[in-house]
Amino acid sequence: YADGMLWGAKVKGDGLGDEVRVGGSTYNHGMKAGRIITDASGNVLGSDDPANNHVWRVRTDWATADLAVDAANYYGVAVSDVTPAQVAVVKGQYEYDWMNWPAAWGAPYNDVDGNGSYNSATDIPGYPGADQTMWTVANDVPLIVNEAGDSTGFLSTAPNLYGSDPIGIELQ
């Protein structure tokens, strides 16, 4: 793996010092899965537990499509070797991601009813007009918190990449 996204910034006022910090992913990574959780005023409380996150993938025809190619890609086998059970697993994941689309976290959707907020009964998960969308969220905030902002763990990934303290960035 030779490609990735890197960023750098001079961070001030977080108590860790006013220095240039670098983050991202190359051969090593400085991020973990999950979103940044803030209070009502926008203050960072911490980050979501990485175990609560994955790459969400939706396609508009998930319920009716032949998913053998998707299953072959997922399992790393030839299409001719795909089993009905493997197709069922892939279809089940599509269904889960469709029904649990994280629009509230920033995942794109087609606002069919035009009300400006995601409504799972009418709106379509994924990038508007796309046949398929893959979406994920990652951050470099080490403190892991629950929805109430209570600490549940700590996972510092930023120093793994160039030894820098975290910036406090979320990538979607």
Language model feature labels by segment:
Residues 1-172:
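A long-range scaffold signal marking pre-active-site subdomains of enzyme folds
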